[in-house]
């Protein structure tokens, strides 16, 4: 007997998941996608299995804007284990080196200024970056080490929250592409004792905070009680991650032409940059870019939600 193909639902929006420990970002995404029975899904940048916290999951039309969330700043809290280095720069790797820990709070506070502002990082081998189409972590698992180009990142804030024994808890605000494992490892080297990430929690991604997240257990319970559609109440609008962008409201006439790919003018448009656009009925219809001629060109269009 032929298996009946599951018909997925066309749902759109963003769910802010508090990613559980031990899950890859994709595994968490696929689990929530199954709970929603959503046709299209994507996440906004990976969190290591070791990490927990804010993971925006995009569904349907919201996937068109996931890149802009990927490019946003992030905030983390991390527990650094001092005195050891590992192959992965976190607790999941094998210990490479053990050194005595003779530093205290004052020593840690003294080195942190070296890691604030614009700094250079060499991405870890255990990362999703690719070399000739192959993820670096796969090469690392095969025992290969390849040269990686340093990358410039910005550490907007780096604070020591607590220091107890051979651990230090840090709070970090950083730009996209920052590797907290590398940051902790570099701090450990500066201290002379080495360090790795024992715990990592993302507390903010772009405009989204932990207070807005929902746990996988909560989603599973709601699904068990009410099915796929009951989970819809956790969906935020597709433009939720873009609320700090200028908002333009088009007339019915302008909306028609813009949705057909034509640049249009708006009297209240900024002189340059990206904008959110609503139609004459207040529906989000996409994002645009203000050109040199003052017209707003469509960049990503959305079907009415």
UniProtKB/Swiss-Prot annotation:
Query: Which species is the source of this protein?
Result: Pseudomonas savastanoi pv. phaseolicola (strain 1448A / Race 6)
Which of UniProt's keywords are assigned here?
Isomerase, tRNA processing
Q: Which reaction does it catalyse?
A: uridine(55) in tRNA = pseudouridine(55) in tRNA
Spell out the Gene3D superfamilies in the cross-references.
Pseudouridine synthase, PUA domain
What name does the UniProt record give this protein? tRNA pseudouridine synthase B
Tell me the function of this protein: Responsible for synthesis of pseudouridine from uracil-55 in the psi GC loop of transfer RNAs.
Q: What EC number(s) is this enzyme filed under? A: 5.4.99.25
Q: Please name the top-level EC class of this enzyme.
A: isomerase
Query: InterPro entries per the record?
Result: PsdUridine_synth_cat_dom_sf, PsdUridine_synth_N, PUA-like_sf, PUA_sf, tRNA_psdUridine_synth_TruB, tRNA_sdUridine_synth_fam1_C, TruB_C
Q: Which Pfam families match?
A: TruB-C_2, TruB_C_2, TruB_N
Q: Which CDD domains does the entry link to?
A: PseudoU_synth_EcTruB, PUA_TruB_bacterial
One GO BP annotation is:
tRNA pseudouridine synthesis
**Which residues does the entry assign to the active site, renumbered to this chain?**
48
Q: Can you tell which superkingdom this protein's organism belongs to?
A: Bacteria
Family the entry assigns:
Belongs to the pseudouridine synthase TruB family. Type 1 subfamily.
Coding gene?
Answer: truB
User: GO molecular function terms here?
Assistant: RNA binding; tRNA pseudouridine(55) synthase activity
